[in-house]
Structures are given as structure tokens and as C-alpha cells.
Amino acid sequence: IKDILGILLLMLFLMLLVLFAPDLLGDPDNYTPANPLNTPPHIKPEWYFLFAYAILRSIPNKLGGVLALVSSILILILMPFLHTSKQRSMMFRPFSQCLFWILVADLLTLTWIGGQPVEYPFIIIGQLASVLYFFIILVLMPITSTIENNLLKW
């Protein structure tokens, strides 16, 4: 009974919020008049695609940016096939651990840059982080796996 009461109170609160104050949690930038010739600066994707959006914006060419965006997402799908190490766990592979945390820091940087405006320092940081993203996944991870295989005599 007390669980049903809690659910009903939560539903009541949400219904009151939606019906009587729908703009309370909204963004005021959404009410500016639209110009169909350009994208407003406050438009950005959800937080989980901001890293790909930063990669898209880091390339000045539109086609190149779209190809980089698609490849940045597809590369995450292909990641298991790029894993060439004989040992599956990273517990005894310190180079791979370090590389993993560098990749996490790079993804966090790209996510932060994706939410920033297109201005001078953010453009350069986004370009460097984009190059580092592809370099880590396509070059450093396979090389590190090969080195660790040789060190472990697999």
C-alpha cells in the first residue's frame, strides 16, 4: 500500500508539472524566433553524442565532417575486432590500462568541446582531441596489444 501511495504521489507531482508549468524546466533559448538560413548556436545533440558532434565540427569540410562523425561511431562498433591481444583482461596489461584512461579523458574532452560554442580555442582543442581519438583507437591500441603479446611471450 505504501509503495502505491508513493507512486501515486510521484505521478501527481509529474502531472502537475506537465499540466500547469510545462516551461518550468525548459530552455528559454527555444523561444527565440527561428532563422531558416542558419542553425541557432544553442542547438546541440544529446550529451551521449556530443563527442561525435565535436568531431563533426572539427573538420571544416561538410562531407569530411559527416564521414568523420559516422566513422567515430562505427569505430566503437568495430572495437572488438581491433583487439588483437591474446589476453582478454587488462589486469596484467599496464600499457593498455594507461591507453584506456587516456581514451576516456579524450572522450570526456570531446564531449565537453561538443557543448561549447564554435570559437577559437575550442576549435583547436576539438581538432587535436579528434586526431587523438582516431590515433589511439586505430594506431596505438593494436601496437600496444602486439607489444604486450611479445612481452608476455604469447
UniProtKB/Swiss-Prot annotation:
Give the record's keywords alphabetically.
Answer: Electron transport, Heme, Iron, Membrane, Metal-binding, Mitochondrion, Mitochondrion inner membrane, Respiratory chain, Transmembrane, Transmembrane helix, Transport, Ubiquinone
Q: Paste the cofactor note.
A: Binds 2 heme groups non-covalently.
Sorted alphabetically, which InterPro entries does this protein's record hold? Cyt_b/b6_C, Cyt_b/b6_C_sf, Cytb/b6-like_sf, Cytochrome_b_C_euk/bac
* TM regions (residue ranges): 1-21, 63-83, 95-115, 122-142
One Gene Ontology biological process: mitochondrial electron transport, ubiquinol to cytochrome c
Q: How does it sit in the membrane?
A: Multi-pass membrane protein
- Cofactors demanded by this protein: heme
SUPFAM superfamilies linked to this entry: a domain/subunit of cytochrome bc1 complex (Ubiquinol-cytochrome c reductase)
Binding partners and assembly:
The cytochrome bc1 complex contains 11 subunits: 3 respiratory subunits (MT-CYB, CYC1 and UQCRFS1), 2 core proteins (UQCRC1 and UQCRC2) and 6 low-molecular weight proteins (UQCRH/QCR6, UQCRB/QCR7, UQCRQ/QCR8, UQCR10/QCR9, UQCR11/QCR10 and a cleavage product of UQCRFS1). This cytochrome bc1 complex then forms a dimer.
What family, per the record? Answer: Belongs to the cytochrome b family.
Q: What does this protein do?
A: Component of the ubiquinol-cytochrome c reductase complex (complex III or cytochrome b-c1 complex) that is part of the mitochondrial respiratory chain. The b-c1 complex mediates electron transfer from ubiquinol to cytochrome c. Contributes to the generation of a proton gradient across the mitochondrial membrane that is then used for ATP synthesis.
- What name appears for this protein in its UniProt entry? Cytochrome b
Give the species this sequence originates from: Cervus nippon pseudaxis (Vietnamese sika deer)
